[in-house]
Each structure stands twice: as C-alpha cells, then as structure tokens.
Amino acid sequence: MTQILIVEDEQNLARFLELELTHENYNVDTEYDGQDGLDKALSHYYDLIILDLMLPSINGLEICRKIRQQQSTPIIIITAKSDTYDKVAGLDYGADDYIVKPFDIEELLARIRAILRRQPQKDIIDVNGITIDKNAFKVTVNGAEIELTKTEYDLLYLLAENKNHVMQREQILNHVWGYNSEVETNVVDVYIRYLRNKLKPYDRDKMIETVRGVGYVIR
C-alpha cells in the first residue's frame, strides 16, 4: 500500500487530509511539528510527502532541502503562501508540486495520483550481493537461486526496494498481506525469521536488521 506522510501544523486540516487519503486506500502518517516531520521522513519509507511551509521548529523549505540531500521521495507543498517567489523557492528547494491553500481536495488527490504514476518501477534490484528479479519472480546470490515462497519473496523485495529506510511492521503488513488483511503484525516477525533462515546458508541473514519497537531495514 502507498505510504504518505503529512507534515501540517493546522490539526483540523491535517486530520481532514488523513481521513480523505485513508478513504482513498493510502496508508497515512501525520506530524504537526517540522522537526518531527523531518525525523519521520528520514527514518521511515514513504512514497510521497505532503508538506506545509509554515511549521513549528523548522520551516517547510528547510525540511524540503534536507530531505533532498538524502532521498528523492516526491514532495507536494501545501501552503497559504501564494507569491510567485514562494512558489519558485519551493520548487527550487526540491518540491515536485506546489498547491496554494485553500484548495479542492479532488485536485490534490489528482496531483498525488499523477506524481505516483511518474515514479519508476524497479524490475531488478541488486542489494548486498543478492539479485531480485521482479519479472522472473527469482532471487539469486552469485548465480545460485534461493527458493522462496511468494510471501517471503514479497517481503524481501519490499525491504530491498526501500534499502536504508526503516519499514514499520504495520507498513510491511499493508504492503505484503494487504490493507484489509486480518492477520496480526507479529506475523511479520515470523516471516522475517523464515526469510533469515533461508538467507543464512548464503551468509546474508544479518543484512535484515531489527529496529527494536519499530520494524525492519536492509542496510
């Protein structure tokens, strides 16, 4: 499931956006403080970030700049600042789109869909000596194929695709088992153990790190 982070200090608007995006089957995290939003953006995986400019602790432009130094996650700025100078600054700092408040929610949703459509799909991933071929549904280490179940494969692909981004258990559950799945989050831990056991003969089991109280990451 697509992961979206909202960084917006106006709580009524933030809750409204969270409700609308959840209704569209996006998985949403919300932060009301600039520094908290930046920390979340840099420590977790997101497909898209919705970012206000006027925030406590650190402003949106600085957040945008710091994110761009480390990753290419799409960013949509939403703000009451309508001057051309502010729009140019936002885009120059790395935002992918700029929407002036007040805005129509349908327009925002359409812009989100447009940005997500433009994101490249990765068919082959090489990480820590492991090659994952999405089209062939195949995982190899130095030419030797590792036999994985579909769930194990999907789990490994998700972590590898988001290398260096900590994936929360709930995020993993939504991506691999589906948003409407009734399984508990501890099933993620069980399948991580299965996956590590299958990677161990190739000395790759330790590449999946546990982030205590949060989830998992491949470094």
Swiss-Prot record:
GO biological process, one term: regulation of DNA-templated transcription
Protein name: Response regulator ArlR
GO molecular function: phosphorelay response regulator activity; transcription cis-regulatory region binding
Record function comment: Member of the two-component regulatory system ArlS/ArlR involved in the regulation of adhesion, autolysis, multidrug resistance and virulence. ArlS/ArlR affects expression of the multidrug resistance transporter NorA and interacts with both Agr (virulence accessory gene regulator) (negatively) and SarA (staphylococcal accessory regulator) (positively) to modulate several virulence factor genes, including ssp (serine protease), spa (surface protein A) and hla (alpha-hemolysin). Could inhibit biofilm development by a mechanism independent of the presence of the poly-N-acetylglucosamine (PNAG).
Pfam families recorded: Response_reg, Trans_reg_C
Domain Response regulatory: residue ranges: 3-116
Keyword Ligase tagged: no
SMART domains linked to this entry: REC (SM00448), Trans_reg_C (SM00862)
Keyword Membrane (UniProt): no
Modified residues (4-aspartylphosphate): 52
Keywords assigned by UniProt, alphabetized: Activator, Cytoplasm, DNA-binding, Phosphoprotein, Repressor, Transcription, Transcription regulation, Two-component regulatory system, Virulence
Posttranslational modification: Phosphorylated by ArlS.
Compartment(s) of residence: Cytoplasm
Description of what induces expression: Activated by Agr, SarA, SarV and MgrA.
Leader sequence residues: none
Ranges of the DNA-binding region feature: 122-219
GO CC annotation, single: cytosol
